[in-house]
Amino acid sequence: MSDLHILNAVTGYQEIIQAKSELEQNGTDFSEYKGQVQRIMHSLHPKRIDLIVQAIIEETPTTKTIRLASQHGEALPAFQAGQYINLFVTVAGTYTARPYAIASSPTQADYYDLTIKKADAGFVSHYLVDQLSVGQTLQSSGPMGNFHHNPLFHGDDLVFLAGGSGSVPARSMLLNLLEQNLQQRFHLIYVNSFEDDVIYAEELRALAKQYAHFTLTEYITRPTADYQGQTGRLSAERLSELLGTEPKQKMFYICGPTPFNQSCQQLLAELEVPARRIRVEANGAPKAPNTQSTWTSDIALNQEVTVTVRGKGQFTTTVGEPLLNSLERHGFFVENACRSGECSLCRIKLISGEVFTPDEAHLRRSDRQFG
């Protein structure tokens, strides 16, 4: 007996064939929707964005805002105020990437503003500030990062402690609140070394005068003789005076150099602010390993080691240099984002040897067990 005779003997088979024929003649063709979910996901979370420098704005003698738009004239992926993108560049023959917080508001979809300050020991920031020009093209990741303002869960009383270029995500949060007419109180406590280091100085001061629910407090730690503003570093006493009653009920954001972040966390702990009410930005270069309590003190930072990339080659570097930097300098690119270990995107398998992991890196139990 043939297969067709067997199928015809199955109850309901002919009815199904008839229904299939009717659907083919009268039904809707959904083939155009094939891959639509993937296309939507890519538009929201692209692996790479093709960007063009639309404008360059000088903020301070060492800081510029780079305005980046889509090369294709498209709206850029949405982001949350406080997040960053990873910018990919080739500098002095090294293909590398650096995370930069988005300074513009999430309500602005036509461009991303990245405010970049030249780092003392950095070479990417110097390239971007000194050599980048309007019309130049770049690639970036999509927006990412856990450091952001959540208007639903972070309450109505927000305090941002910023040091130096740590004001960049603060600006994005502030503009987002103001442009959406959200009435959360926003207090920016902004610390800089010198008067001409203050980024967005005129803009922030003007907004503080215009909006009653935005408070700006500035400190200069190395003032000139004729400086009239507040000077010195933050202390628990100063913070207590600025925050008033019930500091435990406020939501705190901290962004600045690593020592600044650590100091602010300690001050808030002294004021008994719960850890759950503190958000700290962790992207950027990790702090020196010998400043961390888990570092083996008898190992010198300039001690040389050999790194072997299985099947691809080997090179010599020093133990004090982040492994990601060493790999990139020798032509081995590893997908990365935060560069501090916080996001874990650069995770690779350790076959043999020993690698020091900074405190901010989030290793899973399986990472520790299997390398």
Question: Model-found features: residue ranges?
Answer:
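Helix-rich terminal scaffold detector
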Residues: M1-F30
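FNR/FR-type flavoprotein reductase catalytic core
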Residues: M1-T11, H126-T308
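Ferredoxin-reductase
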Residues: G35-T137, D156, N192-F194, T221-P223
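C-terminal accessory/binding modules appended to enzymatic or scaffolding proteins
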Residues: L301-E335, I351
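Iron-sulfur (Fe-S) cluster-binding segments and ferredoxin-like electron-carrier domains
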Residues: E328-F332, L345-G371
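Short cysteine clusters
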Residues: C338, C343-C346
